[in-house]
A protein has these predicted regions:
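C-terminal transmembrane helical hairpin of 12-TM major facilitator-type secondary transporters
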Residues: 305-344
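A membrane-interface helix-boundary motif in multi-pass transporters
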Residues: 89-93, 176-193, 277, 301-306, ...
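C-terminal ends and interior cores of transmembrane alpha-helices
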Residues: 99-118, 312-326
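Membrane-embedded alpha-helical segments of multi-pass transporters/permeases
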Residues: 79, 106-110, 169, 196-204, ...
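Substrate-agnostic recognition of the 12-TM MFS/MFS-like secondary transporter fold
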Residues: 28-81, 121-179, 218-229, 238-294, ...
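Residue-level recognition of pore/gate-forming positions within transmembrane alpha-helices
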Residues: 71-74, 98-105, 192-196, 247, ...
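Intracellular loop-helix junctions on the cytosolic face of multi-pass helical membrane proteins
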Residues: 1-34, 60, 87-91, 102, ...
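Conserved MFS/SLC helix-loop-helix module at the cytosolic interface between two early adjacent transmembrane helices
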Residues: 78-97
Length: 431
């Protein structure tokens, strides 16, 4: 991979190196990657309050059905994405899909402006937003794993991830600012603008990292290659199982928290304050760890340690929940779990993908990030509903039920780390 020579001035480069171990020729591409993820998640976190408000207005029963629809839509979209990835040059896949989603936002804006109370429009937007989030983030990391090498990823993915966290913090602030002068539906246009800006940053990243070169051919292969490789390749099967278990356990904590909040905090404004305070704590801690800690953990302690941080945190959380099923316990566990997921486990998995082939980076990663991810959500929802409703398990018993899953998750993390080491060694020898 080559880089062009136009880079920031020495003084700005020296300032940046205080936070990240970046080489002189990588600075522009790194900053563009940061900005790309920043604008992408800012766009989503502007859309999310609109989606959540629609969810509340549609009601609890409709939400359960909509999440099932989201999972089905994910399954349908996988072969369509496989077709696009197989037939079109990789340099066009991401910008084309991002622009398509931006046009969708404009379309929803027009529809909601015309008939904002239409249940079908509202339900469709809720499903769309849930799909949009996973697809655009998955495509972003596919691009990153294509353009950054394995060694570069260990040094730089923490900083790039911090761009997304900064976007997650900025999006709600932009919403609070714009909502004073715009109607809620007009926020969709702001989101569309930021998504388009993310495309522009993506072009800069690719140009700087590939030098405008030839790493842009279509991935080729069949439309279901991603799904097939997940079930036939041990490395990808373990990544999928890791993500699946992470979502089962994470959704379990989420649903238990929702139950405790409903029974403990009865004022709507107080609930909003509780959730916003939790999210703010997660975002600030995650940002600081991504800037100052993620790269150090990946380089000095390895991918396995970063992967283990998440299931070990969850294991401690389930034990605490077994002894004291209080709201503050669940909230503290969720904060710790999300911090370890965003700042350590997720970057570690993205590092593993840098060792994959171009075909795998797009098709396999997208299948796991969408279908497997939402499959974990759906499974956890049904499992939690069965245990708490049909079988009448108490909250303390629920923690004990989740513990075996978490222990399996720890084992999967260790095996996944070992698989990564083997593939990294093979790649090093081949080089």
């Amino acid at each position: 991979m080559t880089t062009q020579k136009s880079e920031p001035t020495p003084s700005s480069a020296q300032w940046l190196r205080r936070f990240v171990n970046v080489e002189p020729g990588e600075i522009t591409a790194l900053l563009a990657s940061f900005v790309m993820f920043f604008t992408l998640l800012s766009a989503y976190y502007i859309v999310r309050p609109v989606r959540d408000e629609i969810g509340v207005s549609l009601g609890k029963d409709a939400l359960h059905q909509l999440f099932t629809v989201v999972f089905v839509v994910m399954i349908v979209l996988v072969p369509l994405f496989g077709f696009v990835a197989a037939r079109f040059p990789r340099r066009l896949v991401l910008p084309s899909i991002y622009i398509f989603f931006a046009l969708n936002l404009v379309g929803f804006w027009l529809a909601m402006r015309t008939d904002g109370r239409n249940v079908w429009v509202a339900g469709t937007f809720f499903v769309w937003a849930s799909v949009f989030n996973l697809f655009v983030v998955s495509l972003f990391w596919s691009l990153m794993s294509e353009l950054w090498s394995h060694a570069e990823a260990k040094r730089l993915y923490g900083f790039i991830s911090a761009g997304g966290t900064a976007g997650a913090l900025t999006g709600p602030l932009l919403t609070q600012g714009f909502i004073k002068i715009l109607a809620p539906v007009d926020l969709l246009l702001v989101s569309a603008f930021l998504l388009t800006a993310s495309v522009a940053a993506g072009f800069i990243v690719r140009r700087r990292k590939s030098g405008g070169g030839a790493e842009t051919d279509a991935a080729g292969g069949g439309i279901l290659d991603g799904a097939i490789k997940v079930f036939t390749t041990s490395l990808f099967a373990r990544i999928a199982l890791f993500v699946f278990l992470a979502n089962i356990v994470g959704t379990f904590f989420y649903l238990e928290q929702a139950r405790l909040v409903a029974s403990t905090i009865h004022d709507s404004a107080a609930r909003v304050e509780f959730f916003s305070g939790r999210d703010l704590a997660v975002s600030i801690a995650t940002f600081l760890i991504e800037i100052f800690g993620t790269a150090r953990v990946l380089r000095h302690f390895g991918v396995t340690t970063a992967l283990l941080a998440l299931p070990v945190t969850a294991a401690i959380g389930t034990l605490l929940l077994s002894f004291d099923a209080a709201l503050w316990v669940v909230a503290a566990v969720m904060v710790a779990e999300r911090i370890s997921a965003f700042s350590l486990a997720n970057p570690a998995i993205k590092v593993i993908y840098t060792l994959a082939t171009p075909d795998e980076k797009y098709k396999v990663q997208n299948f796991i990030d969408t279908v497997v991810f939402r499959g974990g959500d759906a499974t956890s929802g049904w499992l939690y509903s069965s245990l708490s409703g049909g079988l009448g398990f108490a909250a303390s018993s629920m923690g004990a039920v989740a513990l075996p899953l978490v222990l399996v998750w720890v084992w999967v993390a260790r095996r996944l780390g070992a698989d990564h080491q083997e593939r990294a060694a093979e790649a090093s020898q081949a080089a």
